[in-house]
Amino acid sequence: MQVLIIGSGGREHALAWKVAQNPQVDTIYVAPGNAGTALEHKVQNVNIGITDIPALVAFAQDKAIELTIVGPEAPLVIGVVDAFRAAGLPIFGPTQGAAQLEGSKAFTKDFLARHNIPTAAYANFTEIEPALAYVREKGAPIVVKADGLAAGKGVIVAMTLQEAEDAIQDMLAGNAFGSAGSRVVVEEFLDGEEASFIVMVDGENVLPMATSQDHKRVGDADTGPNTGGMGAYSPAPVVTQDVHDRVMREVIDPTVRGMAAEGNTYTGFLYAGLMIDSTGAPKVIEYNCRFGDPETQPIMMRLQSDLVELCQAAIAGKLDQVESKWDPRASIGVVLAAGGYPGDYAKGEVISGLPTQESAGQKVFHAGTETQGDQVVTNGGRVLCATALGNTVLEAQQRAYQLADQIHWNGMFCRRDIGYRAIAREQAK
């Protein structure tokens, strides 16, 4: 069996690594992939960009690809799933219409309101003056979001009115995020603990994946600007069984039903970014129409079921006939980033200390890497994700940092506290 994975990040490396464990799979093509996927057993990189949909379709037809899994959001929002389905090619992901849940924050907030799904109070703006008037009326802290895709960086949590006004000016007048910021969503600041709740959806049935928690801020103790994610762990202890049941009942099920009722039947991975308050009540912060990055890395370390079988069941509309099995241990992924990220950073730095053989329960997933000759060099802001399993979150953290500390390049940095909330919970018991 031949499988195609679209993307080049740590998420796609983790998906490829997992798919390779299926004995029926002969070759996994990753378009365009990275240095890590190139070195993986059964995996080949293909030099096709993630938004070159005609080339992706032609390649899948040429290689008789039996399953395509889409990693990032950009190809989904421009209709890669629609194009593959039109060509009769099996693909797991949402259609262009369904991917609006991530592609437009204003669409999402209006959808949540229509279906009484809990979320922060908000308003949408395309003009500066009404937006400024709204934040002055509401006061800080307040959240300002670019409407479109901004690689996870289009969200400003403004702790002062000045920060909120600057963000609105930047997005609506300064064009800080291009067309993604030509409309902004301003919403109330939510208190609580965040969790990533990822499920597989076949249009009707839902199969929950393991819970996780992402660390968005660049600095220790959640300081500094937002990033695409500096690390993650699974499971997220904030999601107790009660919270899990509430999320399914109050958020996931009405979302899947609502999308179907509106003619945008949802298939694919659905990721709800949630804020859980002190009473265990969830509110939706955002939806992503794909697996999170870096959450995929620790989640795939824990997944014991066959990912190919789960995706095929979903494509066939039979998710109610399968179940997912999980390693009971905790897993942590620590992102190793290029100096300057999430701002400007250098590329082409030579990476040393990468592990030469696999050790059980530890894995370095590649993201912004490429090979030059026999060297692996940096090629992005988030470069690697050192991931490990442990009997406790603390043990998983220690093993992940043990792996991370062997690796070096000029300017490398990482957060030193990934998993701190879960570790504090463990130690309080």
Curated annotation (Swiss-Prot):
GO terms for molecular function: ATP binding; metal ion binding; phosphoribosylamine-glycine ligase activity. Its EC number is 6.3.4.13. It comes from the Bacteria. InterPro entries: ATP-grasp (IPR011761), ATP_grasp_subdomain_1 (IPR013815), PreATP-grasp_dom_sf (IPR016185), PRibGlycinamid_synth_ATP-grasp (IPR020561), PRibGlycinamide_synth (IPR000115), PRibGlycinamide_synth_C-dom (IPR020560), PRibGlycinamide_synth_C_sf (IPR037123), PRibGlycinamide_synth_CS (IPR020559). One of its GO terms (biological process) is purine nucleobase biosynthetic process. ATP binds at residues 135-196. Binds 1 Mg(2+) or Mn(2+) ion per subunit. The keyword Magnesium applies. Signal peptide: none annotated. It catalyses: 5-phospho-beta-D-ribosylamine + glycine + ATP = N(1)-(5-phospho-beta-D-ribosyl)glycinamide + ADP + phosphate + H(+). Belongs to the GARS family. This is Phosphoribosylamine--glycine ligase. Its cofactor is Mg(2+); Mn(2+). Pathway: Purine metabolism; IMP biosynthesis via de novo pathway; N(1)-(5-phospho-D-ribosyl)glycinamide from 5-phospho-alpha-D-ribose 1-diphosphate: step 2/2. The keyword Manganese applies. Mg(2+) binds at residues 286, 288. It is an enzyme of class 6 (ligase). It holds the Pfam family GARS_N. Residues 109-316 form the ATP-grasp domain. It comes from Vibrio cholerae serotype O1 (strain ATCC 39315 / El Tor Inaba N16961). Keywords: ATP-binding, Ligase, Magnesium, Manganese, Metal-binding, Nucleotide-binding, Purine biosynthesis.
